[in-house]
Amino acid sequence: MKFLDHLCAWLLVALGCIHTFVMLTVYHHASAGALWFFSAGMFQILAGLVNAVRANSGRGTALFRFTAIFANCAVIAVGLMAMYLYIGALWRNPQVPAVFVLGVAELLFTLRGR
């Protein structure tokens, strides 16, 4: 299970990096849309890193555990909203349900502890 926990965390980081770099090909000029696209990628990277640190150090302090739970709930909420918005085009956007599933997995790992 520990391996799967680490894998899910680093997959979130990887998807966040891909999302951030894709922004450069989708948006050719600075815009509000580009900023939101970029910030979503940064959010995924941060959530993945929080989970990677938590997975590496165990349950940790109460504040750190709360931070991981909050980050995972935020990933799940954004994933749900994105799946609702892209419901007709999920086959072209497989990263949307992937991020949601990874958020749920990491939340379960966080709540389970060691």
Predicted features and spans:
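Core segments of alpha-helical transmembrane spans in multipass integral membrane proteins
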Residues: 10-21, 33-56, 69-77
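Membrane-helix boundary connector in multi-pass membrane proteins
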Residues: 59-60, 66, 70, 76-96, ...
